[in-house]
Design a protein with these regions (language model features):
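Short, structured surface patches at the beginning of a domain
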Residues: 1-134
Length: 134
């Protein structure tokens, strides 16, 4: 069972779905580059890194966007995340919360990518940007 098909199996629980996968970690804050914003993004990063370590998830990259609104795709970190997955260098995007990746309806380009939110661990977004229980 390859990793892409493993992702599609709904009978697996969250731990089984992400265990032994390669993930890109993505963090975002939309405020200006202040000490508060930098602390917030550092908190997201540490939260994701700690989770990955505890669950044997290999980190393929960590991408950050500071000062970018969540309703735009024009973010350098986000574009790097998409490129990393398209090149096959990671299996999943790991975020602290779905709204760190995008606010509102997921654009088509994001709808095609596997995303796991730690805050919503029992849910995942699939094609079409719809969430469902796993």
């Amino acid at each position: 069972l390859d990793r892409a098909r493993k992702w599609e199996r709904r009978s697996l629980n969250f731990k089984q779905e992400v265990d032994d996968m390669k993930a890109v970690l993505y963090c975002r804050v939309n405020g200006p580059q202040t000490s508060f914003a930098l602390d917030a993004i550092k908190g997201q990063q540490l939260y994701l890194m700690d989770y990955a370590k505890k669950n044997n998830i290999e980190i393929a990259g960590i991408y950050l966007d500071v000062g970018y609104h969540g309703r735009t795709m024009d973010r350098p970190g986000l574009q790097s995340v998409i490129q990393t997955l398209k090149e096959g260098n990671a299996d999943v995007i790991l975020v602290a919360n779905y709204n760190r990746l995008y606010r509102g309806r997921f654009p088509q380009e994001l709808q095609e990518l596997p995303v796991v939110s730690l805050k919503e661990q029992n849910r995942k977004r699939e094609r079409g940007g719809k969430e469902h229980d796993i």
